[in-house]
């Protein structure tokens, strides 16, 4: 028996990253992890930096990094509106490691004019990118 699917779009300010039928997808919402299946209650919520794990028709998976944004669920369709969205295989591990190191350094060497919230946000994004890279490598 074929799984029930619904339409998912993952878009950023630059481009549409994914558009197609999916069995399910997971994303980190502002209140925790969300697993979305066909027939989910309509919802509009903020998403945190992390991944969108997509299970396409026939069980094929795709992982996309998002830097935050919104997810909207409507009957038969869902849209992830990301600030930035990058396919897992397109992420650069060296750049993510460097961004993580810089953010950790800024947090440890706080000065009066340093924006702690900005550094913490950059650290969360770098850690999320590294996690997506790790999961993408395991899938291959």
From Swiss-Prot:
Coiled-coil stretches noted in the UniProt entry, renumbered to this chain:
none
Query: What is the membrane topology here?
Result: Peripheral membrane protein
Predominant place of localization: membrane
Cite the HAMAP family for this sequence: ATP_synth_epsil_bac
Give the Gene Ontology MF terms in alphabetical order: ATP binding; proton-transporting ATP synthase activity, rotational mechanism
CDD domains, alphabetically? F1-ATPase_delta (cd12152)
- Does this entry carry the keyword Thylakoid? no
Q: Which domain of life is it from?
A: Bacteria
Per the record, its GO cellular-component terms are: plasma membrane; proton-transporting ATP synthase complex
What NCBIfam families does the entry give? Answer: ATP_synt_epsi (TIGR01216), PRK00571.1-4 (NF001847)
* UniProtKB keywords: ATP synthesis, Cell inner membrane, Cell membrane, CF(1), Hydrogen ion transport, Ion transport, Membrane, Transport
Q: Where in the cell is it found?
A: Cell inner membrane
This protein's name: ATP synthase epsilon chain
| Entry's transmembrane regions | none
- Natural source organism: Vibrio alginolyticus
Oligomeric and partner information: F-type ATPases have 2 components, CF(1) - the catalytic core - and CF(0) - the membrane proton channel. CF(1) has five subunits: alpha(3), beta(3), gamma(1), delta(1), epsilon(1). CF(0) has three main subunits: a, b and c.
Query: PANTHER family, alphabetically?
Result: ATP SYNTHASE DELTA/EPSILON CHAIN (PTHR13822), ATP SYNTHASE EPSILON CHAIN, CHLOROPLASTIC (PTHR13822:SF10)
Q: Do you know which InterPro entries this protein is assigned to? A: ATP_F1_dsu/esu_C_sf, ATP_synth_F1_dsu/esu, ATP_synth_F1_dsu/esu_N, ATP_synth_F1_esu_C, ATPsynth_dsu/esu_N
Q: What does this protein do?
A: Produces ATP from ADP in the presence of a proton gradient across the membrane.
Q: Which family does it belong to?
A: Belongs to the ATPase epsilon chain family.
């Amino acid at each position: 028996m074929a799984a029930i699917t619904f339409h998912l779009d993952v878009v950023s300010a630059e481009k549409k990253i994914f558009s197609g039928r999916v069995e399910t997808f997971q994303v980190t919402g502002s209140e925790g992890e969300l697993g979305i299946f066909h027939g989910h209650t309509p919802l509009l919520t903020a998403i945190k930096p992390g991944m969108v794990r997509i299970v396409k028709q026939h069980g094929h998976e795709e992982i996309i990094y998002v830097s935050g944004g919104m997810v909207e669920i409507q009957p038969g369709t869902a849209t992830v509106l990301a600030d930035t969205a990058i396919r897992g295989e397109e992420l650069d591990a060296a750049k993510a490691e460097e961004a993580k190191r810089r953010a950790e350094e800024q947090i440890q060497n706080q000065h009066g004019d340093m924006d702690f919230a900005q550094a913490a946000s950059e650290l969360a994004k770098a850690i999320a990118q590294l996690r997506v890279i790790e999961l993408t490598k395991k899938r291959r």
